[in-house]
């Protein structure tokens, strides 16, 4: 269920401070974060945010279409390598 509109978007304060600092300085370096639960807000547009996926930080370039989504949606945590091949079919 989506979050109530009267509550507003959730964003971790430490991430918000990092984003505001990056916007002020105009720094193009990725903002590193472990906060996958934070929502993307308009001040993050045109920033690269490195979101942790459990193993490494995945760079995510924020565009206007992403506003309202969570950061974790753009950094997949699971890798699919395909099902095991059928040994009988391989021999033929």
From Swiss-Prot:
A GO BP entry is: translation
The signal peptide, as residue positions, is none
Q: Which GO terms describe its cellular component?
A: cytoplasm; small ribosomal subunit
* Family label: Belongs to the universal ribosomal protein uS19 family.
This chain belongs to which protein, by name? Small ribosomal subunit protein uS19
Record keywords = Ribonucleoprotein, Ribosomal protein, RNA-binding, rRNA-binding
A GO molecular function term, named singly, is:
rRNA binding
Q: Which PROSITE patterns match?
A: RIBOSOMAL_S19 (PS00323)
- Native source species: Aliivibrio fischeri (strain ATCC 700601 / ES114)
**Main function:** Protein S19 forms a complex with S13 that binds strongly to the 16S ribosomal RNA.
What the entry lists under Pfam families is as follows: Ribosomal_S19
What PANTHER family does this protein map onto? RIBOSOMAL PROTEIN S19P FAMILY MEMBER (PTHR11880), SMALL RIBOSOMAL SUBUNIT PROTEIN US19M (PTHR11880:SF8)
């Amino acid at each position: 269920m989506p979050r109530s509109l009267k509550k507003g978007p959730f964003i971790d304060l430490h991430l918000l401070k990092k984003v505001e600092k990056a916007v002020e300085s105009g720094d193009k370096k990725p903002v590193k974060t472990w906060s996958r639960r934070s929502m993307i807000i308009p001040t993050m547009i045109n920033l690269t945010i490195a979101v942790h996926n459990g193993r490494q930080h995945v760079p995510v370039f924020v565009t206007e279409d992403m506003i309202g989504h969570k950061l974790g949606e753009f950094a997949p945590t699971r890798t699919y390598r395909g099902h095991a091949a059928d040994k009988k079919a391989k021999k033929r």
